Amino acid sequence: MKFKYKNLILAAARLLAVCALLSGCDGSGAETTAPEMLETVPETTPETQAPAPSEYNIVSGKEGFFKIVRPEELDSTHIAVTTAVEIRKFIKERTGVSLGLGDDWIMPGTEHDPEAFEILVGPTDYKESLEVMSSISYGDYAIRAVGNKIVIFSYTDVGYEEALQKFSTIIRGGIDNSGGNMSLTLAAEKLNVVGTVEKMTASLPLYHDGKLTAVANAGDGAYCIVISDTTEAAYNSYLSALAADGYKTHCTNELAENLFATLYTSEYTVNAGFYKNSDEVRIVIEPFSEDTLPLAKTEIKSVTTPLLTMIGLDNLVSGEYQNNGLCLIYRLEDGSFVIVDGGHSEDATVSATDIINTIREQSKDYAKSDSEIRIAAWIITHPHSDHFGTFVKAYSQFTKFKVERVFANFWDEATFEGFKSAKDTFAPGKYTTYSQTPTIAAKLGAKYIVPHVGQVWWIGGTKFEFLYTLESFLPRTTPTFNTCSLIFRTVTTDKSGKDYTVMVTGDGTGYTMQIIADTFGKALKCDVVQLAHHGSITSGNSGGTQKAYELMKPSVLLWPVGDQHYSTVKEYTYNHVLYDSRNPNFAELYIAGWQGNTVTISLPYTLGTADRKVVVEP
């Protein structure tokens, strides 16, 4: 069984801080002890072929009797590997003896020697490691004596940090320097520790019949467990295991042979998905609240006809064109509105005014005052200032309306902090306001919603189906926030039962577009596409963007870009597949253009009936 894990940029720095703590002293020169941890000691030791000795002689005099082993497949930056290195370093500092350090590779057809004395760190392919791994939960770490092996393992990065602290404390207690002979002997009874470092993932049953790829922090208090090389049957068995643990099924969804389910208890909500194309399962667990459960389809009172409006955002600020940005407004059948992004921070007041004028005009037949206008959802695709800047800077202008929900799903704080200085794009402080999104939602009196892949939210008679969130990309990390941009589609059904589909791609990169193309295939077919990232660069994977567009084959293109920049991005060949002979459905293309421009189409839309308002650039 092979395992791979998320390589956090900050892991090395955090581990060094832990190591400083381990070898540090207090002001009096006395040794400091590791912090108290939540831990449990099993009543019995698992049965093994080689009974564990009562004690383990690690070092005697100048001789070491153990070798430290780490997984061969993990690179030197992985926290399991750095933990192995730090254990070796710590033992040498305390005893003067440097233990051997190697990996778990052996010739095919051979087996590891059960009689060899070894410290196994991380997900090695030793049976002793597998025994320990199968006996603990995803939120745990373990230090266990199994036969002649000492096994140290965790499913999470923080678990390795805790295990390193605990094992170092055990080592301190096993050092004897009396009689002039340095020795390190560890009692077996001390090597039977399980600690819980993450309560939610520790509560989950283990997944069988698959390979664990990652237990990754997904931000917003959620964790994502990724299982590869699995099957639909194993996925269904896991749902049954969740049910046996008390989880209730809230809803399920199927798209292109991919299966999704939302389950919950009074403590946690789980969103699980089986991905047919990649034979993967992704399990996202988060604290339970009613807001984690997607809205089901219900009967609504028909108040008006659905519309979709794109608002232009280009403007001159300090002599520079703003060019990009995204602002879409849905008017739904029940008379409520959904705003997607909103526009720049630099001219947020103007963008907010344009949004407000649009929703007032479109609701004048049924809303007598601003207090009667409902913004059922404000969806933030990602936290770049040309998309959610208006939301951050001008949200106070919307307190006069009833804002019910804010949707967002961003990187967690730790990952963001690690990337701020990774590239010029992430200059310190440039995008730190993204973390204000839940706070602003609260100020608007709105519920804060974190959507997940496969979820369907029914809002005002329209189906909002999420196809990509950052959890689709985990455990990989990326130095561009565009890779965490939401991708979703909306489906509006007319009275005859015909569906009309709009694809909203936000600032999706070529990598995210590749993921949805590989995952959903021909199911990406739609009627309208909002071009990804303004039709601009794909962050190094133009083929992924083109592949997705070839599957979408829309009739109508909404291009969220200013006229100045359009002359550049229209030359990018991956966009051509949307409107050249490779797309026989193409009929209409609309450029967002100058600030205040609008193009409005009905949903469903009849070609040639768009309502356009064009503001002349001053």
Regions found by a protein language model. Give the residues of each.
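Compositionally biased P/S/T/G-rich terminal and signal peptide-adjacent segments
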Residues: A50-R70, K190-V226, R282-L293
